[in-house]
Amino acid sequence: MKKDDSLKKFKYKVAAFYNFISIIDEEILLIKEELTNLATNQKIKGTILLASEGVNGTICGTENAIVLFIETLENLLKVSDINVKYSWCERQAFRRFKARKKKEIVTIGLKEINPTKSVGKYIKAGEWNQFLEDPDSVVIDTRNDYEIKIGNFAGALNPQTSSFREFPAWVQKHLKPLIEENPSLKIGMYCTGGIRCEKATSYLIEEGFSDVHHLEGGILKYLEDVSSENSLWNGECFVFDQRVSLDHELLPGSHRMCHACGLPISPEDLKKPTYIKGLQCDACVNKFTDSDRARFAERQRQIDEIMKRLPENSIWPSS
């Protein structure tokens, strides 16, 4: 039985998807309108980014609604193979639905990078362990540092970036010298759902790197296809929604979100004396003024009042 089938007891299905495909402005506006109307009618929530290079998004709703949404999106894009990963949860993972037109669906900040024309070689989830253990390979985690800290593949390089825009500078300063000294190394990259590492491979190819690979479907596809017994994944996978993190079974993990700084906080962080619910965590204890914390405290008070009036399990725990 597939992991996805065993989780159908949960009310909500989450779809994380992307597709690098050329879209003209008129089509972007049409797609945005169609998807917004569909999301409203089907009570789907989430975030969709549309740009001339494609579409990127994560949505949450009932299974039938999600199936209809993905089918509609594929029809609008005139494709039949959009890259999509599924997971389940007992509560709505988003507060609202947003569809936005952007310059890029994942921002690297370089106009000349075009993943619709050139990307690296895909590595299937079932073949990823072999690549990780290959002494002639170097593996790079293209996610942000705060994501990597809560879960990663051991031995992967951490560029220690706070945004994807910083990745090219890291490549020039660190990766390029490494490959110049070790030209036979194969390069493998991974990210949450496949989009960042796919665009990263496009950048490396543009910069003249060869033998560039990336994990198809990202960490989410790996966790879906590879059993925990055979897995080389450590920790939890950060996701950009109310669940904050997922465990190896693709269920909501143990992390929460600090409402002050927006970083994930672990159960251990919640026990630290620096942690104050809604006001600060250990990572941001020195980042805000008393005026900021007064605003945070009022916001937390309002959140607590709202939660008292809502049915149990209708909203994620506040931190």
UniProtKB/Swiss-Prot annotation:
It is an enzyme of class 1 (oxidoreductase). Transmembrane segments: none annotated. It comes from the Bacteria. PROSITE patterns: RHODANESE_3. This is tRNA uridine(34) hydroxylase. Its EC number is 1.14.-.-. PANTHER family: RHODANESE-LIKE DOMAIN-CONTAINING PROTEIN 7-RELATED (PTHR43268:SF3), THIOSULFATE SULFURTRANSFERASE/RHODANESE-LIKE DOMAIN-CONTAINING PROTEIN 2 (PTHR43268). One of its GO terms (molecular function) is oxidoreductase activity, acting on paired donors, with incorporation or reduction of molecular oxygen. GO terms for biological process: tRNA modification. SUPFAM superfamilies: Rhodanese/Cell cycle control phosphatase. The keyword Oxidoreductase applies. The active site is at C191. Residues 133-231 form the Rhodanese domain. InterPro entries: Rhodanese-like_dom, Rhodanese-like_dom_sf, TrhO, TRHO_N. It catalyses: uridine(34) in tRNA + AH2 + O2 = 5-hydroxyuridine(34) in tRNA + A + H2O. Belongs to the TrhO family. Catalyzes oxygen-dependent 5-hydroxyuridine (ho5U) modification at position 34 in tRNAs. Keywords: Oxidoreductase, tRNA processing. Pfam families: Rhodanese, UPF0176_N.
